[in-house]
């Protein structure tokens, strides 16, 4: 009877020699555009809003008419040459602090931090700052610069010899001992606010979450008891009931997860993103995406916009444990500016940020069986989806023609060609097959497992990995085998795939083969806070092992 032969592990160690890092205080890119300054207010009649889509993880310094440094207070929307200006939500570091991380926030629609990301900041010996800025996940976002006041007249004591400048209330003296920077009151005890503290220029304010309002002290929050108080916190309709109140949305809109805000439904699929907007909400407006050639099509009741991860100016980025695809629906009046057809006050336009989130980590399972259903991973939801991966069984080592309707019955010592295939080819992303294992049943938690790949390393030296032009695709060849026992005539494959950004040298994908000293007791289990896994089950692989 054929037996399962366990082969020796092959450990491949790749040593990288990192180039010597340059000091960002002397190796930076200057941002000197005048429209970046906080004093520059965006005017719709003079052009389109700008977007920092060329900023991509380098070190930058604000110079010239752009300003001295990033503002550390909330900037109103429609400033810095764009709709959503980005400011630094935290104080600048001292020179001795080295490189620190700070949150950067984009202001829009009355929310000082509607979108946020993490940037790095360093104080340089010349009295200036440099910033490592990430590319915004959506447009229209611009990193702002600001001119801070120079304190060269007001001094403590004698101004002869060693003078010490003083700054106005709400500001602090910078490291150059001349510039007055805004003081971030929110960094100390949250500004005394019970919930949200928003730093403003030379001041701050307290805010409350959805369904809550500030008390008269301006610092503590209390629950909204019903629709009579600020419409119950509802963005649209508030209905009173015997047990309390509830928010409702107009026809065609859906209630968001906060149960107070109505929003346009977004359908995130594996290969398409669809936005469906009720026509009566956008009457007189022409809708288009970041790439203005992608426009909405009306079906009589709704205006629908269909696009993919690679089209219409969609920005794809890796954020923590998710792949985030973003775009912006813009609606402009078909009439002349300022006409009664405008439905958005102040901007005379409709702006709908569209975001789909896809988990980075997948577990996909497959086997060989006639009439195999090999559908791509796919979930339809308002704002979440599954990045389109599928596990394919190929006919040969060219990995060009997969089996579709029927799969052959394989014999021992035949070669099995399989691959992890993306159905959408997106630049800037790469994948890592963290693990592949076989089981005699379709259960992923089957006790009997045989690892082909583990911790990103090939565990069986009979396995061959092929290179691919697509950084998201992975191809493998393995000799056909079966599990010990006459009843085990089937084999199922399960692979766990992780998606990363190609430019992130510290990502798990960049580490490649990475054997852990001690494996956790439940390797295939997922921590509740970790990346989510999705399952695609097929199979089984039928083995003809009779001679």
From Swiss-Prot:
Disulfide bonds join 186-197, 193-206, 208-221. It holds the Pfam family D8C_UMOD. The keyword Lipoprotein does not apply. The keyword Glycoprotein applies. One of its GO terms (cellular component) is cell surface. Keywords: Calcium, Disulfide bond, EGF-like domain, Glycoprotein, Nucleus, Signal. InterPro entries: EGF-like_Ca-bd_dom (IPR001881), EGF-like_dom (IPR000742), EGF_Ca-bd_CS (IPR018097), Growth_fac_rcpt_cys_sf (IPR009030), ZP-C (IPR055355), ZP-C_dom (IPR042235), ZP_chr (IPR048290), ZP_dom (IPR001507). Gene3D superfamilies: Laminin, Zona pellucida, ZP-C domain, Zona pellucida, ZP-N domain. Residues 267-516 form the ZP domain. Glycans are attached at residues 89, 116, 299. Residues 182-222 form the EGF-like domain. GO terms for molecular function: calcium ion binding. Residues 520-547 are annotated as: Disordered. Residues 1-19 form the signal peptide. It is found in: Nucleus envelope. May be involved in hepatocellular function and development. This is Oncoprotein-induced transcript 3 protein.
